[in-house]
UniProtKB/Swiss-Prot annotation:
Protein name: Nucleotide-binding protein Sputw3181_3461
UniProt keyword ATP-binding, yes or no: yes
NCBIfam families xrefs: PRK05416.1
Binding positions for ATP per the UniProt entry: G8, R9, S10, G11, S12, G13, K14, S15
Role noted for this protein: Displays ATPase and GTPase activities.
Similarity-based family: Belongs to the RapZ-like family.
Species assigned in the record: Shewanella sp. (strain W3-18-1)
Residues reported to bind GTP: D56, V57, R58, N59
Keywords from the named record: ATP-binding, GTP-binding, Nucleotide-binding
Pfam families on file: PapZ_C, RapZ-like_N
UniProt GO MF annotations: ATP binding; GTP binding
Amino acid sequence: MKLVIVSGRSGSGKSVALRVLEDLGYYCVDNLPLPLIGSLLEQLKGSNDLVAISVDVRNMPEQDKVLVQQLSNLPAGTEITSFFLNSSDKVLLKRYSETRRLHPLSKSRVSLQEAIKLEGKLLEPMSKLVDHYIDTSNLNIYDLSDQVRQILLGSVDKELVIYFESFGFKNGMPTEADFMFDVRFLPNPHWELALRPLTGLDEPVAEFLNRQPLVNKFIWQIENLLETWLPHLERNNRSYLTIAIGCTGGQHRSVYVAEQLAKRFSNGKHKVNVRHRELDHAKA
């Protein structure tokens, strides 16, 4: 089992790091007291081999010896990777001033500046024990995400799941689409009597549309558009991308185009899913 422990001063980016880990398939728990880690791992044993927790200053032992002892009591075979995120006092003060959030130690009737300094002192033992110390003072959320992925995977790239969805405009547009393309201008198999009862999944319809230069040109241009911008979308902390293709009824053209695009992007670089809204509704 792999366990990632994320600690650090509040406002330094622990939540960002935890979101990255969640996207990588980790079971994430925020602000878990260290004595409960062993119980958590026992409960997840056999069901999830990737676990990540963030540790709050309020859950940290005062002495580093206690911390080491608690970690040594974890189940045998646990592979631990630890991060400590930190920023300068000036940057943390600025971030808290901008978000107007309450610092975890502010309830002790101390000023924000005093709370930030106190937290740094309390977390100092932890900062000396971790595997990876990251100063986020000059990092934005994308830079930090890249660093976490680079450490865990050896690469900043993340697997983007692409959904191609066909639909019919007469039944409304899908609300979850990131990109939407209207193919109602393409030649319509509906007007071919032999093709009317078929769908874009059937070979006769596919052959008809494949013979249309306009159809092939459109698919080629959409493919180029997506190939150009996918790397930038992947770097933007996206986990998935939904591309909707719509025709009038969602039976012929949109189905065929969605299938063709899905085939072209099923090249091992991306995880691709294709769904046909109107055809799925007809089966239900």
